[in-house]
């Protein structure tokens, strides 16, 4: 991991981490649906549990960034992925 030297770099790194978490959840959802389609229900439940934990991580990062007053309004990818994740979890 590249060393972070400034507060600005740190905030960018946190945004990247949030986006990575959201992408991971979306990928887990695709895997979950594929497993269910193949009647692999036990395996799908494991993936659902992992995705749920990833969602908790994403929420923690989201809240942290909001508490730090980081402006996410110019990060359309994050907002789009966040809306997708909320749909996945029926929020």
Pin down the residues of each PLM region.
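Non-heme di-metal
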Residues: 1-91
């Amino acid at each position: 991991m590249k060393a972070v030297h400034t507060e600005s770099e740190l905030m960018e790194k946190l945004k990247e981490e949030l986006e990575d978490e959201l992408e991971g959840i979306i990928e887990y959802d695709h895997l979950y649906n594929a497993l269910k389609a193949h009647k692999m229900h036990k395996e799908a439940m494991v993936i659902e549990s992992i995705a749920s934990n990833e969602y908790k991580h994403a929420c923690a990062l989201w809240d942290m960034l909001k508490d730090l007053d980081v402006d996410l309004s110019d990060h359309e990818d994050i907002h789009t992925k966040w809306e997708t994740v909320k749909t996945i979890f029926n929020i």
